[in-house]
Design a protein with these regions (language model features):
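Intrinsically disordered, low-complexity basic tails and flexible linkers associated
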Residues: 1-93
Length: 93
């Protein structure tokens, strides 16, 4: 089950509910707001690496919602590493 505050964030940014399953047992570790509201880091703990499409979609929704902020970063800290999924991050660029 997804952490309640993470679920609230996803609903607020209108993340598609069909993507919620990728965040089962995920937690919002912390939100770091930098000086002058120029950057926010969302740091999530997940069970595994997210598919690149899910990561990009989530980041896009965060950027769209927090459009007054210059730089939004989504940092994922997976407990299990899948090298196959990681390689898709490099080939998608």
């Amino acid at each position: 089950m997804m952490q309640e505050k993470l679920q609230k964030l996803f609903k607020e940014i209108n993340l598609e509910e069909e993507l919620f399953s990728y965040f089962n047992n995920a937690t919002l570790d912390k939100v770091v707001v930098y000086d002058n509201n120029k950057q926010i880091d969302f740091i999530l703990n997940t069970e595994s690496v997210l598919p690149i499409e899910v990561y990009n979609n989530t980041l896009y929704k965060l950027i769209s919602y927090f459009n007054a902020i210059e730089n939004i970063r989504l940092i994922i800290k997976p407990s299990n590493i899948d090298n196959g999924l990681l390689s898709s991050y490099y080939f998608d660029i």
